[in-house]
């Protein structure tokens, strides 16, 4: 097991964290689709998995977050991301989120922000969901509040919103996308229906920053 030691600053790949507004909302699926989209675009991309399923699905650089003693969580996240960078020098590393920052039972995400230090965050959201999954009476915090919480804690921007379209028909999906963009100013994508190419393009400003960083040999903003 590893303690956090700051070597995350050596990682010059674009780091994208896929977080969510709830548990069981589609973060891992979106993360895989984003990896595939970057690869299709000719980029070397890897997923750092944080749960059992991503590990079973073949994410080479993974950790099982809920099996760790708390003292080692940050260090193991850092080690997984750093090892991913050292092993293949990918252009992009996508970090799979767990739970959600404001979830009363599974308050995941802070560790990824603190130790993984993503350059940008993608927020997965189920527009039709009103309560936290499995906890009736616990109203889901609204999307702008959850975005503000992530940005305040991380000092990084949420660059896009991805939609879990449960309980929405085609018209409802398009209405939800338009409402999210109007409310947050962010592009919204249903990657399960349309793939993640558009999401990949929306993240291009951060990718270009990472390319410039590698070209100049300068470490990231935390280095």
At which residue positions do the language-model features occur?
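Short beta-strand-centered segment that lines the nucleotide-binding/catalytic pocket of NTP-utilizing
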Residues: 41-54
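A structural signal for small-residue-enriched, beta-sheet-centric alpha/beta enzyme cores
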Residues: 47-49, 64-66, 98-99
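P-loop NTPase switch/communication element
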Residues: 53-70
């Amino acid at each position: 097991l590893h303690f956090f030691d700051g070597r995350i600053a050596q990682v010059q790949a674009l780091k994208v964290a896929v977080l969510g507004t709830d548990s069981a909302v589609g973060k891992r699926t979106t993360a895989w689709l984003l990896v595939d989209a970057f690869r299709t675009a000719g980029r070397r991309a890897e997923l750092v998995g944080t749960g059992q399923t991503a590990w079973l699905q073949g994410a080479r650089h993974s950790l099982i977050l809920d099996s760790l003693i708390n003292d080692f969580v940050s260090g193991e996240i850092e080690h997984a991301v750093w090892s991913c960078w050292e092993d293949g020098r990918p252009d992009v590393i996508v970090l799979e989120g767990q739970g959600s920052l404001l979830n009363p039972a599974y308050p995941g995400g802070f560790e990824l922000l603190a130790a993984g230090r993503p350059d940008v965050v993608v927020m997965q959201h189920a527009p039709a969901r009103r309560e936290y999954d499995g906890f009736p009476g616990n109203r889901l915090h609204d999307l702008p509040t959850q975005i503000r919480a992530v940005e305040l804690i991380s000092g990084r921007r949420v660059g896009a919103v991805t939609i879990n379209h449960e309980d929405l028909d085609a018209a409802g999906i398009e209405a939800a996308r338009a409402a999210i963009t109007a409310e947050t100013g962010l592009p919204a994508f249903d990657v399960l229906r349309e793939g993640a190419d558009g999401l990949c393009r929306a993240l291009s400003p951060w990718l270009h920053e990472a390319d410039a960083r590698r070209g100049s040999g300068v470490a990231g903003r935390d280095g």
